[in-house]
């Protein structure tokens, strides 16, 4: 009996040590990116990184599905896909993403908005909070939106794929009123340009998890909650594909990125 108790205690100890090691492996201040933003914008839409593995690097984030089939949101450890039809659902963990960014979200600052904000005024408020030019910020908004406009792209099916800025006429827009939900996004510094989407970048998921997309425009209601997580490092997992190895990284795609972010050419 004594040996049995010792064996049980040994198993419990091993389990606790394993849990501690896993906890230590989680970097709560690090942004993880699978893929490369410029490569994705330039037409590398084939998924290479499985969702189940992506969730090992964070419980919060955004990205794109395989073959550009809509938009992704990662929230509370679950990954949701919104297709160009508007259909929104939790993904198959074995499916792949060509580009996604995640982190383990822990709010370092929280603000409850006392009035309505439109896109411009909210960005100005966030500018005052995320003023460090080298800072990496994960941003979560939760509450009711008076109005919100999102978009999603249809899937591509024939290679070579067309660069994303040339597919703006294919995007589908969705507009909602008086809808509860979450913004999931980032404000990333200029030195990350190319590898990721710099500046503000938000995706939306409704409270009912049946609507979403890349955020184009919005107006909040009062009492919106804003949470900001200050990150201090980032890591990137690049695809090991022939398409990636032969991609033209010398081309300046900054204007293409701007057009894709706002959903139109300026």
Model-derived regions: residue spans:
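Bacterial Sec-dependent N-terminal signal peptides
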Residues: 1-24
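Long, positively charged binding patches that form subdomain-scale interaction surfaces
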Residues: 123-186, 191-195
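A hydrophobic, small-residue-rich beta->alpha segment in the mid-to-C-terminal subdomain
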Residues: 206-250
């Amino acid at each position: 009996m004594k040996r049995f108790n010792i064996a049980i205690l040994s198993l419990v100890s091993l389990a606790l040590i394993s849990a501690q090691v896993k906890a230590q492996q989680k970097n709560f201040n690090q942004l993880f990116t699978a893929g490369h933003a410029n490569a994705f914008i330039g037409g590398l839409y084939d998924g290479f990184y499985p969702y189940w593995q992506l969730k090992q690097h964070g419980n919060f984030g955004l990205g794109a599905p395989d073959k550009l089939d809509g938009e992704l949101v990662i929230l509370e450890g679950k990954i949701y896909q919104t297709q160009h039809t508007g259909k929104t659902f939790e993904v198959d963990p074995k499916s792949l993403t060509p580009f996604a960014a995640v982190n383990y979200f822990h709010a370092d600052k929280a603000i409850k908005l006392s009035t309505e904000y439109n896109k411009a005024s909210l960005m100005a408020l966030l500018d005052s909070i995320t003023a460090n030019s080298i800072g990496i910020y994960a941003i979560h908004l939760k509450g009711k939106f008076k109005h919100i406009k999102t978009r999603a792209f249809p899937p591509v099916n024939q290679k070579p794929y067309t660069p994303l800025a040339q597919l703006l006429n294919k995007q589908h827009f969705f507009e909602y009123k008086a809808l509860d939900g979450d913004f999931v996004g980032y404000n990333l510094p200029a030195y990350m340009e190319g590898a990721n989407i710099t500046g503000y970048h938000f995706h939306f998921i409704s409270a009912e998890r049946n609507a979403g997309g890349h955020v184009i425009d919005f107006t909040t209601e009062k009492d919106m909650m804003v949470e900001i997580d200050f990150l201090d490092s980032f890591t990137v997992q690049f695809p090991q594909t022939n398409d990636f190895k032969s991609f033209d990284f010398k081309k300046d795609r900054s204007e293409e990125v701007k057009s894709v972010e706002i959903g139109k050419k300026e």
